Swiss-Prot record:
Homology family: Belongs to the NrdR family.
Protein name: Transcriptional repressor NrdR
Claim: Metal-binding is one of the keywords in the record: yes
Cofactor: Zn(2+)
Domain of life per record: Bacteria
The entry's keywords: ATP-binding, DNA-binding, Metal-binding, Nucleotide-binding, Repressor, Transcription, Transcription regulation, Zinc, Zinc-finger
Residues covered by the ATP-cone domain: 49-139
Keyword field contains Lyase: no
Organism name: Caldicellulosiruptor bescii (strain ATCC BAA-1888 / DSM 6725 / KCTC 15123 / Z-1320) (Anaerocellum thermophilum)
Encoding gene per record: nrdR
Length: 153
């Protein structure tokens, strides 16, 4: 690893620690020439996953799009940013662990709704109304009736 201070090509690892729930390795290094220490991070390079949109276009997976949709659905609701990030992390992990190269936006939307439903039903209905493109009040009522039926069972 090249030293950021003097540019020397060689360094030794002084300390290694897992971070970010084991997804990243933090290494303290020492330059063999100038003896200055610096930190590097190592993480697994993820293969790009393509999202198949409704019109069959393909876009690279972007976790920020999911997070932004969840933030809008949870606006003025008692859902913390930590909970929202956890939902996105879980979905991202499920997608990458599936070892698929492509996933439909429909599948991602269903995953988001499933997780939102467990945390906050109002946020779930808000997300569903945009995602499923509710046309009128009857569509809202149908979705609410489904929720009530699930709650009773």
């Amino acid at each position: 690893m090249r030293c950021p201070f003097c540019g020397y090509e060689d360094s030794k690892v002084v300390d290694t620690r897992p971070t970010n729930e084991g997804k990243t390795i933090k290494r303290r290094r020492e330059c063999l020439k100038c003896q200055k220490r610096f930190t590097t991070y190592e993480k697994i390079e993820k293969q790009p996953i393509l999202v198949i949109k409704k019109d069959n276009r393909r876009e690279e997976f972007d976790r920020n799009k999911i997070l932004n949709g969840i933030i809008k659905a949870c606006q003025k609701r008692p859902v913390s940013i930590e909970q929202m990030n956890k939902i996105v992390d879980e979905i991202e992990n499920e997608i990458y662990n599936s070892m698929r190269e492509e996933i439909s936006s429909r599948e991602i939307g269903e995953m988001v709704m499933e997780k939102l439903k467990k945390i906050d039903e109002i946020s779930y209905v808000r997300f569903a109304s945009v995602y499923r493109q509710f046309k009128d009040i009857n569509t809202f009522i149908e979705e609410l009736q489904k929720l009530l039926t699930e709650k009773i069972e």
